[in-house]
Every structure is written in C-alpha cells, then in structure tokens.
C-alpha cells in the first residue's frame, strides 16, 4: 500500500501544526511531545454534525485545541494534502460520532497513527476502511517512500477487524457474511461475569469467523433494540441507499427506534443561530423523519406546540425499552446508561448501525472486565456523580489502563443506590473509556421496573457474575470519606475535591440536565437545594443564569406533580423541555464568550463542547448551590455561608 501525501504530526505547539500545514516537514523528534486525548469534539465540532456527506472534509480537525489555540482552519487538511495524521494516547476519545473518521477520510487521510485509540473511534475507522496503527515507526518509513503492506497494518488487530479492513469496510463485509448469521450457541463454560453471560446468549455464528468470546475476540451479536439519533440517521440513510439502493429491506424494523433529542433547542443555541445553521438543522431533521416514515420506524421526536423533545434517548430507553439480561445498541457513546438495569448496552458508530439495520447483527469486540466495588456508606449529600468524577481522576483510569473495558459496579453502595443513581455511573463509563457499564439486577431493579413501567420482572438465576469470574482489574473504592467533587475545565478526568479548591470561582451559567443528570432523583436533588434556598429567602445570584432541563416528559410530569416547578421558578431558574440541549452545545446553558464560567451537571467538558467558555463539572446539588452563591460551592458550603452572613 503506497501512502502518498503529507504527514501531519500533532504535538503540543500550535505553531508546529501551522508550519506543517504550510508545507514544512517536521520529524517526530522535532515536534516533541505528541498531543494526547484528541477528542471527536475536536476532530468534528458539534455544529459540523449537521453535515452527513463528503462536505465534512472541510471541517476535519477545525476544533483541535492546542493550549488556547485552534491551529487547523477550515479545509486545511485538504489544501495541505495530508494523508497521515500522528498523535498520542487516547486518540478519538469522546462521542461515538462516525463523522470524525468520515471527515478525515473524505479529507484524504489514509492512515491515523497514534499511541492508543478509543474503542468506538477505531471501530468506526475499520467500518469505513480507514487504517489505524499504534506503530510510530511507520511514520519515517512512509516519509521515506516505503510501501506498507495491508498485512502489516492489520497484523496486531483481531481477526474480524482484519477481515473488515481487507473487505474495504463493514458494509462490503456484511453483504457477504452477515445475512446468513445464526446463533453461536456458546455454552456456559467456567465462571463468567454477567456481561459474558449476556453476550454468550446473543452471539452469532459468522461464516469464516471463529469466535470463542474471549477478550479481544471480534464478533457479532443480536440486539433486542437498535436506536439511532438524528445526527446519525441521515448519514446512515445516505450510506445505505448509496450502497443498496431503495427501498431497503430492514431487519426487524419493529425493534429499530429513532430519536430526535439533540436539536430540539437549536433555535435557542447561540452557536447555531450565530452561524446561521437553522436551515441545516431543518434539513437534517427532515431527512431523519423521512427515513422513519419511509420504513415505518418508531420516532420519538419533537414535542408539538411546545419546546423540546419527547425524551433524551438514553433516559427513554431505561424508562420504556431496556430489560435485564438483554442487549441494547445505540449510536451514542452514553448508551451504557441502560446498564443500570443489568443489560449489556453499548454505543456504536453510524456504519455499525446501518449494517445492523440490514442484518440485525451488531459488531462487538469482546472486552476484559473491571470490577468496581464501592465500599462503605455514601455520606449525606454525596451523589453518584461525585463517585464518577472521583473514579475518572484515578491514575488507572486517566492513564487509559481500563480503556475499552466492561465496568461492573458492585458493593454495598451500589446495593443502596436507586436505578437513577446507578445510571449516572453506567452512563459515565463513556468518559472512563469503557465499552459498557453494568450493575447486576436486584430488588431495586424489580421495584423500578414495576413502579416506572408496570412490569413484574423476575430475575433469572443466571443474572449475576459468578464468584470466581475473571477480571482484568478490581478497584476497591471507599466512599465513606468522599465529598462533593468537581472536574476542572477541559476534561472530565480533571477531578478535584471541592474541599481542596483553593480559589474562588465565580459562576456565570449553571446548568442541570442531560442524560446524566435529568432523571427523577437528579431533580429531587436540585429541588432539595432550591427549596432550602427559598425557605431562607435566597434565589440565584445576580448575573447568574440557571437552567434546569428534564430528560423525559415523564420526569417533567414527576416534577409538576410534586410542585417542584414552582420552587425552581421562584428562585429564578429557567425550566426547559426535554432535550440534550447544552450538553450537545445545542440550546440554553452554553457560553457565548471565552471569559464565561459554567458549572454543569453534564458528563463531559472537552474544549469547545459547551461553548467558548470554561465548563466545570459537578453534581446536581453543587450546580444549584453554586448558582445561588454566585460561585462554586457545595450545598453544605452554601448553608454555612448563609448562616454566617
């Protein structure tokens, strides 16, 4: 394979990137330290996701942040003739958007070389036929004009990844192999984790592919439900109709679910309004809805006569569809949210889902498991979000030693947790770099399903991990001494205990919502602080905007029934209809100026994701307490401050 064109090495100096794009050749040792943690938010910033074809080439890497600089301009990779990108660890972290490798490939990139890759990004590259490698030695060999064989590029990949890359991508592979897939019928052999037991029940037998479901083995599974959101549905439709023509014969269309949850507040998004993107929003939504209508698919869309959507996808999946012991696949990295019920839920890319629409088969590379035992008793006022931010700050997780793993949460703290709180943990496995997160079903699961869905669910004998199941790592985490946590701007892994914050951080915007923090119990926590403030004659601080956004209409109705809405409005909060909103940089709650500071209950704060300002992550009570104080404080700090002034 002859790779021609320029090599762009992403380091920690913006000027070095500009010089390379201008035509200068720099060697690895001249660039120095490689830029790590390049996120998909940087490769294709959120507003660019309104494009779903080769137009994306213009926007590849336009959000790349090096320090406070963004050195890659619009269409820069195309103009420079870049064919190879080189970077450091955890390349492609963040959302599951296939737009990122699609944009790179459309811009002329043939190979991405990085010290390590995030799972979904690399799988998306495979599915598109875009090669990736962790061998930095390739860089100078390519520069010297040496041909690199496909055999060498796939040598360290699992058999399935190699087969897909050789075929030219997943759709080409699927045409030949997936339509005739049958159950693999893997027997329970030896001690297994709950995740392994679920996968073994849904694994498929693919001609020419030997799969024993051991870690690192690539294969396919059947999912009970496949869901797709509006950012990805038009791209999937475009790919499928281009490949197979129309009409399509979809596999079990009754189990395909469409969601419009990201863009229902685009008309109030500073970014979308400023850039004049509303016509593109409408076109994208029209394409999404047309695909649903053409094939008779369920679509949970925008509310009629009011702002917002019916629900955020993950929140509704757990409220209405997911069940213990089953498999759910969705085109969003936070699909593991449903793992709180004890199902195997994982995020996939657009081509993965497009192929699954046709065949019912979802690509899965089996992963190692990490057991996270939460010990002790969680102190009053400390939440699952605080636990998640603490886990993200652990060196083991920050250094990527659990990358691509299955996180199983257990221990007395989990046993005492509600499903809403468990979902915060499984949801944020995405930020931990995991494949999925799971909690074994128990009496709380049964209670939740009966109370929320009217289901009398019976837990089957096999729905637990065996005592001697094998784990790559076991993390014992003592929650007894845990206090409110924060994540400093730039990365959810920038965790710091609020008690250790040695500076006063004034707040301009406070946001509570998203799939992570828009559930019933989250609103119980918001209300606890708001009611205390109201009872003590307090409201949100001058010049602070507080936005609270429910995850589903059921959560909104829950708040109405309990009288929460009156309290929230009385302290000065603006209530928003269900939508991803500010978390997706698509609605009220995002910053408009670089000097603005936001405190948010969302799940990630990568550069540029919440607007040009600085985003601090926190728990629901800390968000509302900070809005009232006008600076970052815990609820306890707020109460102490109020009694001493």
Residue locations for each model-derived region?
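Fe-S-dependent hydro-lyases/dehydratases of central metabolism
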Residues: 1-645
